[in-house]
């Protein structure tokens, strides 16, 4: 047994060195429990003239004096054996940029220390400790485990006793930092708000990798693994392929309840929209930060709230096959859960008026239009929903009571025309989403795509003139439609990097039927329009369909 010595750059300030040491100490606690002692040792760069930080045979923690704002880590390995020869970890000069960008949106409502541009060094050190936990884990041979953050319930993650004992994730090798399921007042109760220690899965992995075993090592390791069979805390989640998305293995997710997770994140962003202008009135704050701040809200909404929750639609839980395991290899997300998620996405993302409610917030970015309109006109959330439609095939195939593509589109259609069914004109958000919906349905039908292309090249149509058609622009319709399309087959040669053995389900007939039913609903919606502009919008959407059917 040899110690793992890391040489740390003397340019790193003392408070950060202590934060890094704290991270190493947390890993050493697990090693001590295994009877191995404290193998991770941190020393300053040696002053000896022969010392070289770029020596591939020594472990280093370097100060990165560049524009990067994330902790980086990679291993130098022996390609013949896979042995880790050394680890190279980088601590960025601009770590505060990353803390400020991600922490404010997720934690400002819970932790007042994030309600400012000037993030305190104490907060940065907490973040550095959290990030170094994963970096050290990588150096010890642990792989990214995207399922770690999905192991615990929202109730557990709001419990002071639970979070102080177990942390906020079963594995720090996941891509999660903050306990955004916490609510105002939880910090004062003692709820842990940031990753602060390795999880139970990490502890087990160290035992599996480093603990002494009997002579029959293989049987011992299998026995240890089977002791936790079916326990979500010990599930190792790889990045899943697009055609078989495991919703437990998503970036930025937290907790085992996607609805509660979405509600918590939306509440935090609402708080930021309402209160953030008061945090950034100092003239010394860089203008580029203020100007981009509202745009980060859109990124937060789409990448960190919409994407993880939408993965449950057509999602499938994938477990490693084992002859002794009672856990099925493939278990589709239940139809009820998929329907709940779809309904939640509509109820959440089709009322974004709160995004535009604070004009001071919008003015942070200069002369900003309504942000909700920008989101709708760029195809969200319909783009995400139609993307999931193309990934439902395997889930439907493996389920005994599937949520089929046809049922999914029926539910989307009911939501899109909810106003029409209640005798009301279509709202602007629904008009924008319908254009994406129609374009995506056409894009998933190779025959209709061919017809649409032929019509476009044969006649001077609306599509050819929409870039300069001021009448269309005055109607508030998209001039360049966002859509989801099936991949076109083209001739040619390119390097083959992977082989995909899965062939998607042919849903062309279903999409064609939905276009026809959408047309019928649009005719009904047109009759409910209160003015010529609304009727013009309906006419344009009907024309989109008539081009191909």
Where are these regions (language model features)?
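Short, well-ordered beta-strand elements
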Residues: 4-9
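Metzincin-family zinc-dependent endopeptidase catalytic domain
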Residues: 1, 14-139, 143, 167-168, ...
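Conserved catalytic/binding loops enriched for acidic/polar residues
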Residues: 149-549
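Acidic, metal/ion-coordinating pockets
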Residues: 146
């Amino acid at each position: 047994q040899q110690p793992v010595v890391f040489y740390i750059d003397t340019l790193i300030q003392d408070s950060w060195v202590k934060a890094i040491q704290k991270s190493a100490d947390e890993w050493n606690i697990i090693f001590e429990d295994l009877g191995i002692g404290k193998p991770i040792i941190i020393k300053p760069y040696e002053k000896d003239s022969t010392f070289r930080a770029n020596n591939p045979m020594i472990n280093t923690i370097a100060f990165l004096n560049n524009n990067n704002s994330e902790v980086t880590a990679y291993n130098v390995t022996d390609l013949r054996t896979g042995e880790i020869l050394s680890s190279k970890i980088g601590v960025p000069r601009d770590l505060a940029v990353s803390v400020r960008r991600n922490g404010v949106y997720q934690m400002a409502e819970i932790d007042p220390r994030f309600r400012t541009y000037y993030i305190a060094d104490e907060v940065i050190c907490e973040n550095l400790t959290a990030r170094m936990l994963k970096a050290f884990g990588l150096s010890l041979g642990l792989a990214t485990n995207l399922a770690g953050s999905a192991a615990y319930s929202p109730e557990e993650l709001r419990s002071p006793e639970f979070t102080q004992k177990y942390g906020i994730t079963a594995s720090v090798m996941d891509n999660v930092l903050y306990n955004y399921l916490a609510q105002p007042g939880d910090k004062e109760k003692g709820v842990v708000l940031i990753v602060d220690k390795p999880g139970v899965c990490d502890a087990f992995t160290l035992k599996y990798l480093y603990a002494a075993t009997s002579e029959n090592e293989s049987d011992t390791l299998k026995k240890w693994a089977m002791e936790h069979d079916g326990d979500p805390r010990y599930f190792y989640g790889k990045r899943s392929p697009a055609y078989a998305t495991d919703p437990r293995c998503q970036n930025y997710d937290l907790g085992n309840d996607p609805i509660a997770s979405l509600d918590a994140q939306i509440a935090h962003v609402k708080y930021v929209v309402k209160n953030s202008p008061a945090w950034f009135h100092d003239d010394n704050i860089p203008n580029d930060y203020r100007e981009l701040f509202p745009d980060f809200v859109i990124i937060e909404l789409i990448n960190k709230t919409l994407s993880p929750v939408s993965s449950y639609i057509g999602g499938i839980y994938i477990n490693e096959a084992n002859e002794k395991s009672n856990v099925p290899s493939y278990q589709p997300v239940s139809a009820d859960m998929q329907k709940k998620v779809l309904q939640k996405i509509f109820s959440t993302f089709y009322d974004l008026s709160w995004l535009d409610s604070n004009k001071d917030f919008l003015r942070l970015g200069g002369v900003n239009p309504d942000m909700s309109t920008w989101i709708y006109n760029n195809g969200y959330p319909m783009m995400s929903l139609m993307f999931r439609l193309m990934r439902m095939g395997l889930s439907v195939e493996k389920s005994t009571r599937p949520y089929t593509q046809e049922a999914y589109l029926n539910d989307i259609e009911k939501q899109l025309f909810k106003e029409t069914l209640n005798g009301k004109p279509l709202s602007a958000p629904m008009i924008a989403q319908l254009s994406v919906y129609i374009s995506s349905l056409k894009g998933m039908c190779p025959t209709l795509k061919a017809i649409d292309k032929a019509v476009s090249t044969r006649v001077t149509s609306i599509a050819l003139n929409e870039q300069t058609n001021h009448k269309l622009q005055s109607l508030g319709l998209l001039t360049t439609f966002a859509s989801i399309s099936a991949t076109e087959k083209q001739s040619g040669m390119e390097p083959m990097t992977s082989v995909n053995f899965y062939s998607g389900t042919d849903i062309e007939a279903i999409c064609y039927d939905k276009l026809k039913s959408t047309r019928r609903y649009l005719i009904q919606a047109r009759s409910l329009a209160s003015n010529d502009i609304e009727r013009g919008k309906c006419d344009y959407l009907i024309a989109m369909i008539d081009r191909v059917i």
